[in-house]
Amino acid sequence: YHEWDEKTALDWYLAEEPQHRDLLKYYSDLLHIYQKYPALYRLDSDWNGFQWINANDGDRSIFSFIRRDETGKKNLLFVINFTPMARDDYRVGVPKSGTYTLILDNEHGLYKRGEHAFSKRSVKSECDGQPYSFAYPLPAYGTAVFRFN
């Protein structure tokens, strides 16, 4: 197949191949999540919509942050690994007690083995300057997004 070219039509037949089909599904799910979770677009220019959890893990190149909307009911926690090393039991700090449900994972979830339900209840264990935390198997070059209230 040829690279994208603004002068020609897209090679839609490629969407039938597994790798391309998975990428198309991933993009579709990203758009669905964007529409479903106002935390991704509301309060964009307001610090109330964003909170760093860990921006200082330079040794492992893993960053985590929270996006919020004005209701605080559909918060999203992002954990991103920028290295080729998987972290089997990565502990991430969270601001409150509750259940954190995986909604997007570019390694373990929706794009390789079908629906993947994963929820973790936070425990009272300080991490990243937060009073609660939970552990998650973070894949190499992986991004995990969790919803919580």
For the regions a language model picked out, list residue spans one by one.
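Carbohydrate-interacting/catalytic domains
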Residues: 1-149
